[in-house]
């Protein structure tokens, strides 16, 4: 899950991001409401949730929510604010926030509210992705491969790490499309991370090794000089 965090308090933003990353979220953190709107306007489909402070430079969190909803954007938003009066909460929710968390707060409550948003939103329900003989289960990071034998079907289950799962899923969602390593890094790593240029290749070696250990074919092919392609063709 990729989250857009919009928080101008440096210490708080760093603390929130650290906790979210430890929970396996991918986090893009910006400190300005106008910058956040640029991200959401141009690539909102890459995000599954936004955590937005109310008092921000540029656009306020309230204005950001209003712009989202005016455009019919249903991206779930958790509003953070030091304004804790009932009328403030009503104003935030009426502007389009899905939940409201008053500062100061403990991180456990923040995570609990994120989980609650996930339960309420159909788009967050884990959906098994299947293509050909390959199935991915987001609830447990499990890859299942069905191998056709002359007299029966054999099913192998392979446990992937979070990052391996993300790479396999991203390529599987874009079958027959060549995707560069830099594009994969841009999609799956945080904006302020600087992974080594060969990190995707290293992860691909691990994925292929796990498949080979189970005598399973790997549907991800390397296209020299261009990137990777998920294909069911031999």
UniProtKB/Swiss-Prot annotation:
Phenotype upon loss of function: Grows faster than wild-type photomixotrophically (in light with glucose), specific activity of photosystem II (PSII) is about 30% higher, most cells are single when 90% of wild-type are doublets. Increased transcription of most PSII genes under most conditions, transcription of PSI and phycobilisome-related genes are mostly decreased. A double rppA-rppB (nrsR-nrsS) deletion is less tolerant to growth on Ni(2+), no longer expresses nrsB (slr0793, involved in Ni(2+) resistance) in response to Ni(2+). Loss of expression of this operon.
GO molecular function: phosphorelay response regulator activity; transcription cis-regulatory region binding
Location of 4-aspartylphosphate modifications: 53
PROSITE patterns, alphabetized: OMPR_PHOB, RESPONSE_REGULATORY
Free-text comment on this protein's domains from its UniProt entry: The N-terminal response regulatory domain inhibits DNA-binding by the rest of the protein, in its absence the protein binds specifically to the nrsRS-nrsBACD (slr0793-slr0796) intergenic region.
Main function: Member of two-component regulatory system RppA/RppB, involved in the establishment of the appropriate stoichiometry between the 2 photosystems. It senses changes in the plastoquinone (PQ) redox poise. Another group shows this two-component pair, renamed NrsR/NrsS, controls the nickel-dependent expression of the nrsBACD operon; they suggest the photosystem-related activities seen earlier are due to the expression of NrsS (RppB) in the absence of its natural substrate NrsR (RppA). May accept phosphate from Hik2 in a possible Hik2/RppA two-component system.
The protein, known as: Response regulator RppA
Classification of source organism: Bacteria, Bacillati, Cyanobacteriota, Cyanophyceae, Synechococcales
């Amino acid at each position: 899950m990729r989250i857009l965090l919009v928080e101008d308090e440096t210490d708080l933003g760093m603390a929130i991001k650290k906790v979210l990353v430890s929970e396996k979220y991918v986090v893009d953190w910006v400190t300005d409401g106008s910058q956040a709107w640029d991200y959401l306007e141009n690539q909102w489909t890459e995000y599954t949730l936004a955590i937005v402070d109310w008092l921000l430079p540029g656009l306020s969190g309230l204005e950001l929510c209003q712009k989202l909803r005016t455009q019919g954007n249903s991206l779930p938003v958790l509003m953070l604010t030091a304004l804790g009066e009932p009328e403030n909460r009503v104003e935030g929710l009426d502007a389009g926030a899905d939940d409201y968390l008053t500062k100061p707060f403990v991180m456990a409550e923040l995570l609990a509210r994120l989980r609650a948003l996930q339960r309420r939103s159909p788009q967050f329900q884990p959906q098994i992705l299947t293509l050909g003989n390959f199935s991915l289960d987001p609830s447990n990071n499990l890859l299942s491969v069905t191998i056709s034998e002359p007299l029966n079907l054999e099913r192998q289950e392979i446990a992937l790490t979070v990052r391996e799962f993300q790479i396999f899923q991203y390529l599987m969602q874009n079958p027959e499309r060549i995707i560069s390593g830099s594009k994969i890094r841009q999609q799956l790593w945080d904006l302020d991370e600087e992974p080594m240029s060969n990190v995707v290749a290293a992860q691909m070696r691990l994925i292929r090794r796990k498949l080979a250990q189970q005598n399973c074919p790997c549907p991800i092919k390397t296209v020299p000089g261009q990137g990777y392609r998920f294909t069911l063709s031999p």
